[in-house]
A protein has these predicted regions:
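A short helix->loop->beta-strand "cap" motif at the edges of active sites that frequently abuts
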Residues: 47, 117, 196-199
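Short glycine-rich anion-binding loops that position phosphate/pyrophosphate groups of nucleotides
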Residues: 54-58, 180-185
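N-terminal nucleotide/polyanion-binding subdomain common to many enzyme families
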Residues: 2-98, 102-103
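Conserved beta-alpha
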Residues: 11, 85-171
Length: 201
């Protein structure tokens, strides 16, 4: 699935310190920095995406130029893998710490309760989403789940993809948590950059 048209970031990517690793512009950040950045720029980040990068995705990008473009095409690629943050520290970025996708999601869900942030979960099995529908409100009382959807594992038709976009738009999320597995999820975010409501992660 190719990206449709061009996308201009509404937040300056130069605000994000980066440590290039095998060509991937990995954000040289820690969790407090990321949460502060998210809170300050969330509205302007709608339609953009964050890659959650580890050794596997970084090596895959090094070997596949099209995937490298995907990894570097969002607002940032956060260092989910410990070796990435360790490499950054050795290269002169002492502030660079491992920031995992699940930790970021849970931090945003907790922080977002008081702020009224709305979350949409896209991907995974229906069984997993059903469990999350029960677990998340218990763990984060007051959380706003805008929607959940488990798409087919096969490639979607244009009609199905458009229906997904309309479903997400109607839900008006602040965050779109994409769980399709790498590299599919990153390619999906790149293809839908600028077409969805919410920050994709």
């Amino acid at each position: 699935m190719e990206q449709r048209g061009t996308f201009e970031h509404r937040v300056n990517r130069d605000l994000v310190p980066v440590c290039p690793i095998l060509g991937v512009e990995v954000a040289a950040i820690d969790m407090p920095w990321l949460l502060s950045f998210t809170e300050e720029h969330l509205k302007a980040l709608s339609g953009d995406y964050i890659c959650v990068s580890n050794v596997h995705t970084t090596v895959t990008a090094y070997e596949d130029p099209s995937y490298m473009e995907v990894q570097n095409g969002g607002i940032m690629a956060i260092p989910d893998g410990g070796p990435l943050s360790s490499t950054g520290q050795k290269r002169g970025f002492p502030q660079m710490q491992r920031v995992t996708g699940p930790d970021y999601m849970h931090a945003c869900m907790e922080l977002g309760i008081a702020k009224g942030w709305r979350h949409y979960l896209y991907g995974g099995t229906q069984q997993t989403l059903d469990k999350l529908a029960n677990i998340l409100p218990q763990r984060y009382p007051g959380i706003q789940i805008a929607g959940m959807y488990s798409p087919p594992f096969r490639p979607l038709t244009e009609e199905e993809d458009q229906a997904d976009m309309e479903r997400i738009a109607q839900a008006e999320p602040d965050f779109l948590w994409v769980g399709l597995g790498a590299p599919k999820q990153e390619k999906w975010m790149r293809a839908h950059q600028g077409q969805v409501n919410g920050l994709m992660v």
